[in-house]
A protein has these predicted regions:
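NAD(P)-dependent Rossmann-like dehydrogenase/reductase catalytic/cofactor-binding core
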Residues: 2, 223-343
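Conserved SAM-binding loop
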Residues: 30, 78, 105
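A short helix->loop->beta-strand "cap" motif at the edges of active sites that frequently abuts
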Residues: 98-102, 122
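Active-site-proximal catalytic alpha-helix in oxidoreductases
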Residues: 185-213, 217-231
């Protein structure tokens, strides 16, 4: 436990990670740009509300402007910020990462593509995360996913199973279950496909995950977005990695069959947690930018690169822009707008 660890971006996911590693006895600091959250953690520690328990961690929290006061560089940086903040945060933390240190983007999207060139690919380890949480009150995080159900997939960008990967596995087991993969980009693409189905679409519709089957036409929209995303991934030559407890056999069928299986599996998981709100919906409620551009928007950009049409994903991006601009509110009425844009 002698490794120095920074959790960079301590919103909902970062707060959960930072609390667990602190409670496990690691040398860890939490860094964030939300002043009230940092001040609350400095004064009272961090409260983590689980479905059946409440935990407290006496964390070490720092404002971004205080990082320059830290005396030693970090062995490990767990970047848990929004995807659209990845580039500048990677530049920001680069001087504070040891030459032989490692940065792990514990985020949605394909962040390694733009983080690795900044810090060096040899210092980047890929990660896929399955953990739902939200934070609206400074110093208090609602963790929706219990430890035994949370999951992290870790992998070297070159596909190797290395000693540092084993070390990260041991560390992250304090937060949830961990798997090591030799196909981390395939796993990240699977998560991107699922995110393109769920986060943006359900966010603009103002729906929780379990409500996806309650409104006619919504599940079909999700499957349409996911099918486009998987077609893009396959056109670009990625081998999709099974996650969410699915097997290789579940991913062996046609693109549409695989996406339907993935969508139904995730929605079924959502029915077990009716208080869970997707991160895009949380962002709308907070009045801030969503990650939809880094998810569905990335699918649209990659689709152009692969010559694969992505009208459903493009529609989600457009409605997200309209909501962020104040032209409309998230809600079920946006389904008609999405269908109009898709044509």
């Amino acid at each position: 436990m002698n490794k120095s660890i920074a959790v960079l971006g301590t919103g909902a996911i970062g707060s959960c990670v930072g609390a667990d590693l602190t409670r496990a006895g690691y040398d860890v600091v939490l860094i964030d740009q939300w002043p009230a959250h940092i001040e609350a953690m400095k004064a009272h520690g961090l409260r983590v509300q689980l479905p059946d328990a409440e935990l407290h961690a006496a964390v070490r929290a720092f404002h971004l402007c205080e990082v320059c006061t830290l005396k030693a560089p970090f062995d490990i940086v767990l970047m848990t910020a929004k995807s659209y903040d990845s580039t500048w945060l990677a530049e920001f933390i680069k001087p504070y990462l040891k030459a032989d240190g490692v940065l792990v983007p514990v985020q949605n999207s394909l962040n390694d593509e733009w983080v690795a060139p900044i810090i060096g690919a040899e210092r980047d380890v890929g990660c896929v995360v399955e953990l739902s949480a939200e934070v609206f009150t400074p110093g208090v995080v609602q963790r929706n996913t219990a430890h035994e159900k949370a999951w992290f997939g870790l992998g070297e960008l070159n596909g190797g199973i290395t000693p540092r990967l084993r070390e990260l596995e041991a560390i992250m087991k304090n937060v949830g279950r961990v798997s090591l993969t030799q196909n981390i980009m395939g796993a990240k693409w699977t998560k991107l496909i699922s995110s393109s189905m769920l986060l943006g679409p359900l966010g603009v519709l103002g729906l929780k995950l379990w409500e996806a089957t309650e409104v006619p036409g919504v599940l079909e929209l999700l499957i349409r977005c996911g099918t486009e995303s998987m077609l893009v991934a396959r056109a670009l030559g990625y081998s999709i990695e099974p996650i969410f407890g699915l097997s290789a056999a579940d991913f062996a069928g046609s693109t549409e069959a695989v996406v339907k299986k993935l969508a139904n599996t995730i929605v079924l998981h959502g029915k077990a947690g009716t208080r869970v709100r997707g991160v895009s919906l949380q962002d709308y409620l907070k009045g801030r930018q969503t990650e939809t551009g880094c998810l569905n928007g990335l699918i649209v950009a990659k689709g152009k690169q692969a010559a694969v049409a992505t009208p459903a994903n493009a529609a989600v991006v457009q409605v997200d822009r309209e909501i962020c601009a104040g032209a409309r509110q998230p809600g079920r009425a946006n389904l008609a707008r999405l269908q109009q844009l898709i044509g």
